Curated annotation (Swiss-Prot):
Signal peptide stretch: 1-27
Lipid-carrying residues in chain (N-palmitoyl cysteine): C28
Taxonomy, superkingdom: Bacteria
Species annotation: Mycobacterium bovis (strain ATCC BAA-935 / AF2122/97)
Protein name as catalogued: Putative lipoprotein LprH
Alphabetized UniProt keyword annotations: Cell membrane, Lipoprotein, Membrane, Palmitate, Signal, Transmembrane, Transmembrane helix
Main localization (coarse): membrane
GO CC annotation: plasma membrane
Lipid attachment, kind S-diacylglycerol cysteine: C28
Amino acid sequence: MACLGRPGCRGWAGASLVLVVVLALAACTESVAGRAMRATDRSSGLPTSAKPARARDLLLQDGDRAPFGQVTQSRVGDSYFTSAVPPECSAALLFKGSPLRPDGSSDHAEAAYNVTGPLPYAESVDVYTNVLNVHDVVWNGFRDVSHCRGDAVGVSRAGRSTPMRLRYFATLSDGVLVWTMSNPRWTCDYGLAVVPHAVLVLSACGFKPGFPMAEWASKRRAQLDSQV
C-alpha cells in the first residue's frame, strides 16, 4: 500500500518504494475535468488473439447502481477541464483526455451520469489489443499525480475553476490509484483502474468530501476484469 495526505500514511519518499496502482483521474470543481498532454506508451507491446470488448459496453449502463444510487448516462459536458494551470497538475485534474491513459488504445468511450443531488460523476474507458503492464501504468500514474504540489486551476469551455490542491493520493489495492483534489467549497475524488486490456478513469465531485472512491474503484476494476 502507498498513500499520502492522511494520518498513518508514509510520505512520498516511502510511497515511492511501494508498488503503485492506478486511477482514475478525473477533474472537476465548480466546473469539471478535461483534456491535456497524453502519456507515453505504457503498454508491454505483447499481442493478443482475443477480440477486444467494446469500450462503451464497459461503462456503467442505464439502471446500474453506484454508491450514490441508480445511474443514467448523459453526455460529458463543457464543464469538464481541457487544460490545467500549471500543466504539471494535468494528471491530477483532468478527466476528459486524461494523460494517465496509455497511448495506443483500440477503442475509447466516456459518459457522464445523471444522479440524485449535486454530484457530477463520469467514467471513461480505453481498450487495448496489446497487453498493458498494469504495474507500470499505475506507478506512472502515481508519480504524475504527485507532481501537482501547489494550487491548481482547471480550465474548461465553461471557464476557470477556483484553485484546488492535491489532498490525498494512494494505491490501496492492486491495479487501482485514487486521489482527491479539493478547495474549501468543492471536492473531486478520482480513480484509475487498470487491467491488462483496459484502463478506466473515474471522477466524482461534490460539495462535501467522503465519496468512497477507493472501494468503488476497486469494485469497478473487478467488474472490468471480468469483461475483458
